[in-house]
Design a protein with these regions (language model features):
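Chalcogenol-based redox active-site neighborhoods
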Residues: 1-150
């Protein structure tokens, strides 16, 4: 399946266009909220493994509906070395179908479903993780990519 194309503004103040990354592998991970426990663990884990992802020609981007300002604070606080993309209007979130019903403490509500998409050099989605459990997730994504490119 072809990855939905989108444009956004990144935390590095560049106009992000997915098309500009053809020829590279891409990890797009969608997370609910900056600076919350699970999202911080997941982001820090991807950050720690970033050099290994870069070695195999892979870029990482985190996406949530937080504002660009929130993302900048989050990046600075934890020394995150990759771009975060803001999707306050949920346009990207809806294109990737990661907005849906969630449950927490017996309450049902609509929210962002923690998900990761692995995209190949030609812009094709080659692996999807939905309802991600953050522990060891970044490592699993890296190992999956390494296995796929052997």
């Amino acid at each position: 399946m072809k990855a939905p194309i989108f444009k956004s503004i990144s935390t590095n103040k560049i106009d992000f266009d997915l098309k500009n990354f053809s020829g590279k592998y891409i990890v797009l991970y969608f997370y609910p909220k900056d600076d919350t426990p699970g999202c911080t663990i997941e982001t820090n884990d991807f950050n720690k493994l970033l050099p290994q992802f870069k070695k195999i020609n892979c870029e990482i981007f985190g996406i949530s509906k937080d504002s660009l300002n929130s993302h900048k604070k989050f990046k600075k606080k934890y020394g995150i070395k990759f771009d975060l993309l803001s999707d306050e209007n949920k346009e990207i979130i809806k294109k990737y179908k990661v907005w849906g019903k969630k449950q927490f403490m017996g309450r049902e509500f609509m929210g962002l479903i923690r998900s990761t998409f692995l995209i190949d050099k030609k812009g094709k989605i080659i692996k999807i993780w939905k309802n991600v459990k953050v522990k060891d997730h970044a490592k699993e994504v890296l190992e999956t990519l390494k296995d796929l490119i052997k």
